[in-house]
Amino acid sequence: MTTTEPPKGLDSALTKKIIKAASKAHVGVFKLTNGHIGSKWRVGAGFKKPAPTLLLEHTGRKSGKVFTTPVLFLTDGANLVIVASQGGMPKNPQWFANLVAHPDAVVHLRGERGRAVRARVATPAEKVALWPRLVDMYADYDKYQTWTDREIPVVILEPR
């Protein structure tokens, strides 16, 4: 895997605080408007080609607390596909570890609240098949993969 230099400060404490605050605001607006505002990601590659966004309710692996996180998604038949890119940061996002520990989750889509799903990590073959579609949806995923040494996981959310 080829690694290029990520932006300076990507993994800084300040960046993490900004992301946390922005995510909290995103969740609040999405819930308030039932996804009519917040269901499209318009940052980075999403500025010119907005990417669909859902809210992911997942259970903390240590706390048991329910967390809600905005995540970009791709529809693949009855499944939803999400990417644990964390913007190319060195570590996987917390929601990924939570889904591995507690795969049952709930997603909220524009105009739809409370779809029950079960998460699983895509197999290597599934990831190879899905990655071009994911990059077509949000081109920055390819760039994020070059910023980190970790293999960015792809997660499939299946209906339950």
Question: Predicted regions: what is each one?
Answer:
Residues 5-9, 86-141, 147-151, 159-160:
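Short, structured beta-strand-loop surface elements
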Residues 53, 152-154:
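Short hydrophobic/aromatic beta-strand or adjacent loop that forms the aromatic wall/cage
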Residues 58, 75, 109, 157-159:
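Hydrophobic side chains in beta-strands
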Residues 16-61:
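Short, conserved active-site entrance elements at the starts or edges of catalytic domains
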Residues 45-46, 72, 97:
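Short secondary-structure boundary/capping segments
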Residues 51-87:
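Short beta-strand segments
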Residues 2-25, 157-159:
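Long, non-globular segments of proteins
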